[in-house]
Amino acid sequence: MKSVLVVYSGGLDSYTLLNKALKEFDRIEAITFDYGQKHKKEIQYATQVCLELKIEHEVVNLDLENILSGSALVGGKKIPEGNYDKEQMKQTVVPNRNMIMISIAASLAIKNNLNTLWYAAHAGDHEIYPDCRPEFIESLAAVLQICDYHKINFQAPFMNYSKTDIVAEGLRMNLDFSKTWTCYVGDESPCLRCGSCLERKSAFELNNVQDPLR
């Protein structure tokens, strides 16, 4: 039986990946992390989707706000506005976040006897986020083959996809993107000004469709 644990934030990329997993695996589980992020609304979206899809879902409270608070996503810094710019968007890097999350996710996969671990890093993240780059993914994949008696196949299927490509993939699957949350600001509605919102807007425009959250 093919089995997978999907690291699922509640965002557009991991929502598409979760639905891709439903087509490719016999057994699917999901894990979501509350690490003190301002945009906790994404956790609500992840929980609701997993309920609808009847996917076993673990929400992990990391309670690491004091350690991770150097990032604008967690601490008191303002979320930067405007299109993705490397120096500006470095403020949204959460120190070693994906390493921490993937390590915990691997432990859950081992405990639940799942063979594969997926997460939704994509090509648009490479420039800004070190823990989304191919060398990180490849190195961690090697580690997860030797860190336990139960080997985990760690993969990032969207590693070479742009955000536009991911939206296109979701549209081919007829996904409802209103069930995703992208904005980094913790308001009730998307701010439409942060880099994450603007990247999402561009991805839908390049696919000639209206973002359902607009």
Regions found by a protein language model. Name each.
Residues 1-174:
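ATP-dependent adenylation/nucleotidyltransferase module used to activate substrates
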Residues 103, 179-202:
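Local cysteine-cluster metal-coordination motifs and their immediate loop/turn environment
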Residues 186-187, 208-214:
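Short cysteine/histidine-rich metal-coordination sites, predominantly Zn2+-binding motifs
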Residues 198, 204-211:
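Short Fe-S-cluster ligation motifs
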